[in-house]
Amino acid sequence: MAKCQVCGKGPVTGKNVSHSNRRTNRWFKPNLQKVRVITDEGKIKRMWVCTDCLSAGKVKRYVSTKVEAQ
């Protein structure tokens, strides 16, 4: 299963609980995004990163800058 390549967050198990208190198994999956990241060596790499790491600034996201011809 998929994991965040920065913090290691992965899916965990839990229970769905209905109104009658009947329990069934379920998975809680992390919100992973495949983003281009600038590594410590300055290389651009695609990684699976959870949104918690993105919003906390634990990775530096690569943004391409295209120059338009006028």
UniProtKB/Swiss-Prot annotation:
Q: Does the keyword Ribonucleoprotein apply?
A: yes
Superkingdom of this protein's organism: Bacteria
GO BP terms in the entry: translation
What keywords are annotated for this sequence in UniProt?
Ribonucleoprotein, Ribosomal protein
Q: What is this protein called?
A: Large ribosomal subunit protein bL28
Kindly give the PANTHER family that the UniProt entry links to this protein. 50S RIBOSOMAL PROTEIN L28 (PTHR39080), LARGE RIBOSOMAL SUBUNIT PROTEIN BL28A (PTHR39080:SF1)
Report one GO cellular component.
Answer: ribosome
For this protein's source organism, the top of the classification is: Bacteria, Thermotogati, Thermotogota, Thermotogae, Thermotogales
For this protein, what is any one GO molecular function term?
structural constituent of ribosome
- Keyword flag Oxidoreductase: no
Q: Which family does it belong to?
A: Belongs to the bacterial ribosomal protein bL28 family.
Positions in coiled-coil regions: none
